Amino acid sequence: MASSDAEALCPPVLTAGAMQAADRYTIEEYGLPSFTLMETAGRGCAARIQDAYGPLEDEAVVVLCGKGNNGGDGLVVARHLVTDGARVHVVLASAPDELSDDAAHNLSLLRQLQADGAVGERLTIGELEDVETLTAAVAPLRPRLYVDALLGTGLTSDVREPIRSLVTWVNGRTAPTVALDVPTGLHSDTGAVLGVAVRADRTATMAAPKVGLRVGEGPTRAGTVEVVDIGMPPFVLDRAAEKPGCVRETTDAAVRAWWPARDPDAYKYSVGTALIVGGAPPFAGAPVMAAKAAGRSGAGYVRCAGPETIHATLAGALTTIPTLPLPTGDDDGIAPDAALDALAEAADTADAILVGPGLGRAPGTAQFVRRLVRTVDTPLVLDADGLNALAGHIDELADQRQAPWVLTPHAGEFRRLAGEEGALTDRVRAAQTYAERWDAVCLLKGMPSVVAGPTGRTVLGSIATPALATAGTGDVLAGQCVGLMAQGLSPLNAAAAALHVGGAAAERYGATHDPRSMVATDLLDMIPRVAAERFGEGRRQR
């Protein structure tokens, strides 16, 4: 079991190398034969296919098999589907004598089944000649489904012929495609398309998700991803997950364990004081949403500070949340010296501070943010214009700050912080690199959102919904994060929990509404509902 509570409670997402290590541990140290693993994997995939598309009795299924163990999994799937009554046509993309040992064994089992007459004429096995011949062969079958078992996690270079043509061919079919482990042509670590890649409707992945299914082109190429239990012990997967490049992903179970509980004798100051600093004309709504999100996440006492020019707006919108006006200067931004004095008592008594929603980019405001970061010893969340104020100064501020901090950039903000070096071709590595460099928890928002800690611990958000593609959801996320930190969650767990709960709230909205109609304030109504339904019975684990 990994030392971090985030790692222990969130399941692993593995690289190809880590998955190979898990196979090796299971076979050599745990004593489970490779053939048994293949059988369990194929049987599990066949069951998932039946669950999604069945019953497949008398339906035609075309199984495309490569020469490696991915192809062997496909041969096991073919055997189980045909014995369950499907009409199965197996296409071998290589000569039988080129198959891996376990795949060759499974081909012999299929041929024996065919020879025994046990499945009648429902099983046919052929070698690929060309796609024109294949088209003619499968057209009379009217396939219900295609299974991609051509290439698995070992692929690192562009797909070559004849598999390249097969990928293009299967992508042109109208029936759905199920990929085994990863879609052929997808890099299992980066999600990059290696020349061509299968566009699957579903992917049955073995033992644990692969990183490439979650990043890059993975989500659009893999479709719905289901994890198939192949009999690997959990401790084997945890051990493999310690390999470089592996991450974890959020789950309801993890958030339930982290979710703050209240003692019967709790009072407002005992369950977290959060301070939100934000707002500037015309963005007064941003700190309002953040402050409300902090309260909806359970912080007992929330205060909101903003420029005096919008104080009346903040006070009118936040009838249950005290507001604090900050002096402004000649540039219409916050006056640094006077504002720091005005904020001192609130900052000293807060358990966590959020800086940035709607704050604006006036020079005085940016100077105020940088001085606040240098001086306060309260945990910080920096978002939006709070991040923009750090651009060009973040490396020195990382050394000068007094408290832990969470940075919540979207792609544009991240590039401004990281400069020309901040390429996002590999989102996970980028978040990890700069979290370590800035000694921060970096919540890099996007697809997927990545939470990386300064020691390398990394958690992906596991809920993605287009409902979140609307203005203001980042303000709500930042407010959730500071609210959870104020209640005692570690910065990494607070960021991961906020990400998961916000996604669950958007998902909940989309279950009863058109996701395109959601606005950020709808999340404020959904967060307490989702918390009660899915997380509220948990115990706090900081």
From Swiss-Prot:
UniProt key word Nucleotide-binding: yes
Binding site for (6S)-NADPHX 2: G358, D475
Region (NAD(P)H-hydrate epimerase): 1-243
Cofactor: binding details: Binds 1 potassium ion per subunit.
Record's protein name: Bifunctional NAD(P)H-hydrate repair enzyme Nnr
Keyword Transmembrane helix: no
Residues that, per the record, bind (6S)-NADPHX 1: D181
HAMAP family given in the database record: NADHX_dehydratase, NADHX_epimerase
The protein's Enzyme Commission number: 4.2.1.136, 5.1.99.6
GO terms under biological process: metabolite repair; nicotinamide nucleotide metabolic process
Keywords: ATP-binding, Isomerase, Lyase, Metal-binding, Multifunctional enzyme, NAD, NADP, Nucleotide-binding, Potassium
Residue positions binding K(+): N70, D148, T184
Reaction catalysed by this enzyme: (6S)-NADHX + ADP = AMP + phosphate + NADH + H(+); (6S)-NADPHX + ADP = AMP + phosphate + NADPH + H(+); (6R)-NADHX = (6S)-NADHX; (6R)-NADPHX = (6S)-NADPHX
Residues covered by the YjeF N-terminal domain: 19-238
Domain YjeF C-terminal residues, every copy: 251-534
Cofactor(s), names only, from the UniProt record: K(+)
Job description of the protein: Bifunctional enzyme that catalyzes the epimerization of the S- and R-forms of NAD(P)HX and the dehydration of the S-form of NAD(P)HX at the expense of ADP, which is converted to AMP. This allows the repair of both epimers of NAD(P)HX, a damaged form of NAD(P)H that is a result of enzymatic or heat-dependent hydration.
GO molecular function, one term: metal ion binding
InterPro entries membership: CARKD (IPR000631), Nnr (IPR030677), Ribokinase-like (IPR029056), YjeF_N_dom (IPR004443), YjeF_N_dom_sf (IPR036652)
Family, as annotated: In the N-terminal section; belongs to the NnrE/AIBP family.
Region annotation NADPHX 2: where it falls in the sequence: 410-416
Gene transcribed to yield this protein: nnr
Residue ranges of the region described as ADP-dependent (S)-NAD(P)H-hydrate dehydratase: 251-542
Residue sites binding ADP per the record: 445-449, 465-474
Region (NADPHX 1): 69-73, 152-158
